[in-house]
Amino acid sequence: MSTHFSANQYEKSFDAKRLQNWEVPKHFKEHPSSLEGFTQIISNDRGHILEGIPRSSRSPWGEFVGTWDMTKPPLRTKTLKTKAMTENAQQKRKSASPKQEVARTPSPAKASPRRDSPVQASPRNASPLQGSPKKASAEKVCTPSPKAASVSPVANKSPSPKLATPEPC
């Protein structure tokens, strides 16, 4: 704990001389200037509307329509005006004009590549090299050895003989 404490002990480090900041600070008003006009008080401290305040004939709560009560949502202002947005708007205007419809049929060259693809989908937990077709044809085929067949499930600590893991070739 410090032996010396001052209420403004850290103020000196933020002094313009210490920060080597030679700009003259902007002068701000100490208090804001008063506004013209007044606010009309329409209710008392308990929230009851005062006498003499005109009330709505349709609703005792007034006819104020909030944002969520509006029938139509407020307009969205587009703050980002890009070239793509203006081109898109021009295309929409052009497409609004009547024109002949052209029947389009997909060409055989642009058919979906997923159907014709020879690569098989691999499971999620498999490594990328396990499911590749080139790797599968290059792998040598292992035949189970008689030693692997004679291993009991108890030695493998496997619950059933079907789940026993074969030894690598």
Swiss-Prot record:
Single GO biological process annotation from the record: cilium organization
Subcellular location, record wording: Cytoplasm, Cytoskeleton, Cilium basal body; Cell projection, Cilium; Apical cell membrane
Region listing for Disordered, in residue ranges: 53-169
CDD domains: Flattop
Comp. bias regions, Polar residues: 119-130
One Pfam family per UniProt: CFAP126
Major subcellular location class: cytoplasm
Keywords: Cell membrane, Cell projection, Cilium biogenesis/degradation, Cytoplasm, Cytoskeleton, Membrane
Record-level GO cellular component terms: apical plasma membrane; ciliary basal body; cilium; cytoplasm
Function: Acts as a regulator of cilium basal body docking and positioning in mono- and multiciliated cells.
PANTHER family: PROTEIN FLATTOP
UniProt record similarity statement: Belongs to the Flattop family.
Official protein name in the record: Protein Flattop homolog
Organism: Nematostella vectensis
Upper taxonomic lineage: Eukaryota, Metazoa, Cnidaria, Anthozoa, Hexacorallia
